Amino acid sequence: MKKNILNIAFAIAALPLTHVSGQLLSEKMASTAMSLWKDSLVTTPGRMVKWSYDQGVILEGIDALWQRTADRKYFDYIKRSMDHYVEGDGTIRTYKQEDYNIDNVKNGRSLLTLYKVTGQQKYLKACATLWQQLHNQPRTREGGFWHKKIYPYQMWLDGLYMGEPFYAEYADLIKDDKAFDDIANQFIYMENHARDKKTGLLYHGWDESKEQKWADKTTGLSPNFWGRAMGWYAMALVDVLDYFPAGHPKRPALLAILNRTLTAVQKYQDPASGLWFQVLDKADGKGNYHEASASCMFVYAAAKAVRKEYAPAAFFRIAQKGYAGIQKAFIEPNDSGWVNLKGTVSVAGLGGNPYRDGSYEYYLREKVITNDAKGVGAFILAASEMDIAAMAKPGKGKTVTLDSYFNNEFYTEPASGAQASYHYKWEERDNNGFHFWGNSYTYRGARINTLYDAPTSANLKKSDVYIIVDADTEKETKNPNYMKPEYVNTIAEWVKAGGVLVLLANDAGNAELKQFTTLSDKFGIHFNEDSRNKVTGSQFEMGALKIENNPIFKTARKVYLKEISTLTLSGNAKANLTEGKDVLIATVKYGKGTVFAVGDPWFYNEYVDGRKLPADFENYKAANDLAAWVLEQSSKK
């Protein structure tokens, strides 16, 4: 109980800090970024800027905003930015694989987003090029990636962020399970060589050959702990864990590394300001200063680690205090009504020409600027995490389970060539998926889960919410799993004990309804096997519905709901939304539990992610409204 109270207190404390003039700081900073860099990181008119990791940091922040707001301008910006470089055949302009520069892999994550959302092969082909680079990247003797071909035998902390999150996400896409050993080893090698046992911090770089002038002749390590290098490393860990298999034997090692990293980060957080210094362990060093990008990265890593349960809730203190310090020290309003980020060191590295010796004095010589892309991107990521942390958490400690037994379609994934489950799945980011609706639950503190087996008392016991959508016909699946009396009884007993059942059917011809409705009939809700709200082409108003004074949909006022099965009610079932004589949405209390039913899958990405519907339709608000209501009902047991 104390832990939950602590989490809530931190979230509330963060809430007023995230706003300036009524608008979220994450959105204001994104507006600044999209204005400064309209389609690439071109800062001088007529001058082409090369494929650069800086842009990838910004685009990941923009993607985080798109996922939280469903505002299409964010997706359009990501696509426009990458299309500036990616040709129709997947060639990446200005990219040279033969450089074996691991920085160049970073933007692959934005390409993966575009492929997953659009299915366009040019993005997949570009990703395959970056994947090929990783497979051919020169390595240390034990297998660690060189940072660049021009920096032989060297591993830098920066490189873990530039390469590993893409490596993990692409490996997950193509089902290359063996790759995860290699991914984990990159972090293990880096920590084994670069972690200082006394401070817990990691040195910026390690030279296996010990030939560099900056390298210690015994250890091969650079002399100092650079803030942003540790920031890259921390962000890499939380991003890789998103795709690292839950049952992989090396996942515990990554979690342990993350927790050791956050412990060191917490130790060197300035207690007065909540910020971190350019050189982390020399708070009293002459000329040392609080640095913005590192501070943003640590806030992002800590907040996300806690949200995703990669680290204990106590680490949220790092993020809450750091975010307050960032706003006080580095955020300033600009003439456009948005904000700027001050205080980011433009660059720091090791070796090269002119030679960078890694000394304390060197790190303090590099220029500090306003609105550096790396800092801006890290701030958007950090602010987005804090925006999520500030949301109410009715789902805390609850599990929302999505059925994949009655809805069990498969297709051949082009990237892997393997059969993959699809259509209304949490992980799908294309039109067919529930990615955005899944966020509606996780942002509110719930865990999401998928049940591939038939429902039983045992496998439903761990779920607070059970969602069944669009039961298969023989047209969709060779051997459909139909609803049976034993399943009806099992589910009904689970609801009676306090479960929340969400039934999202479909209209006649697009779902199996004859057997499926034996389940809903148990609760007094019958799917009529008809088809209402037929829509022709892009005449979206044909599917428009107005919502007023609705106990479930408290913020959505106009929604799009097409080709639906209407409902007939009996017993205690109540209509939630009607039009004319037709019942479109219904609910019923059953024992200690609740049932919600509508004759359409409704909240799949196509109609909630902002890319298709006109802006006056509020399906994303409706999806959030339903998620909040469902989670609230699950607490009323």
Predicted regions located by residue number:
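Short, surface-exposed patches at the edges or C-terminal ends of soluble domains, predominantly
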Residues: 392-637
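Alpha-helical scaffold segments in carbohydrate-active enzymes
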Residues: 32, 61-64, 84, 129, ...
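Extended ligand-binding groove/face enriched in aromatic
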Residues: 76-79, 87-215, 221-222, 333-337, ...
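Inter-helical turn/loop segments and adjacent helix faces that build the functional surface
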Residues: 69, 170-181, 240-252, 305-313
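CBM-like carbohydrate-recognition segments
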Residues: 24-56, 68-78, 84-104, 108, ...
